[in-house]
Amino acid sequence: MKIYEKMSWVGLANYIINNLKEGDTIEFATDYTEWEGYHCWYFIRIVRIPEYQSRFIVIDYCGGGEAYVIPLNNYSHEFDEDDKDYVREYIKDYFKLCNNLGFEDAPVWVEEEV
């Protein structure tokens, strides 16, 4: 069974900061469709490019083939203060982007019931 909780950009940013570790994936759904009750599934993941030791948060959105990328501090495995600021800023912009595409609401966070 899935539990759906509508989140604001602040809620999603804080969830990422408090819970996302390298290699983890957050799955979420949006109700950005013209069909009621139909959800599109996406993911948020931290990825590392080993050649550069660079880390990014990648958000798959708006139907495969497009991604939203948040750069992270290269020197840490945890979120430092700059990372937290980046995440908040970029997630706020991500919500604006989705709204500019005609989507009316925030992503729907989806959790698995244990």
Regions found by a protein language model. Name each.
Residues 2-36:
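Negatively charged, low-complexity tracts enriched in Asp/Glu with abundant Ser/Thr
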Residues 24-109:
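Acidic, low-complexity, intrinsically disordered interaction modules
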Residues 111-113:
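Intrinsically disordered/linker segments and immediately adjacent domain-edge residues
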